[in-house]
């Protein structure tokens, strides 16, 4: 650490950016993030994740929010992850401009590379997320 404490300030700033990223991802207040995340995954892992989320990968200007969402949704699909984890990133992707047509095209493309079982599992979650949103929109 330097004498002027800049490493400490950078660490805090990175943590604060991570907290902001998780608050946006999970639609909770920034004040809730550290304790809720630590309760879910343990304090040591939570702290590492907060630091990582505040790093350059999540804020680099070379990727738009839409592109970042597509990359994360692709990574989750490749790993066969669905449910709440995928739903959370689908919601964030929609906020970044991904619509059902774009996500369907993405899954169709991925099916040829990662296989239909994984792509169709993700597509079921995508379809369900748009169906439930459409139903709640028409109920209002």
Stretch-by-stretch model annotation:
Residues 61-67, 97-101:
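Structural motif
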Residues 1-65, 119-140:
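Acidic, glycine/proline-rich low-complexity segments that act as flexible tails and inter-domain linkers
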Residues 55-58, 87-94, 107-111:
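Amphipathic alpha-helical segments within well-ordered protein domains
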Residues 82-102, 119-130:
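Extended intrinsically disordered, low-complexity coil regions enriched in Ser, Thr, Gly, Ala
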Residues 62-63, 79-84, 116-118:
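Short helix-coil transition sites and intra-membrane helix breaks within transmembrane domains
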Residues 67-76, 86, 106-110:
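Short, structured motif recognition centered on aromatic/hydrophobic residues
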Residues 69, 114-120:
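Substrate/cofactor-recognition hotspot
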Residues 16, 48-52, 69, 84-88, ...:
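A generic alpha-helix surface/boundary motif
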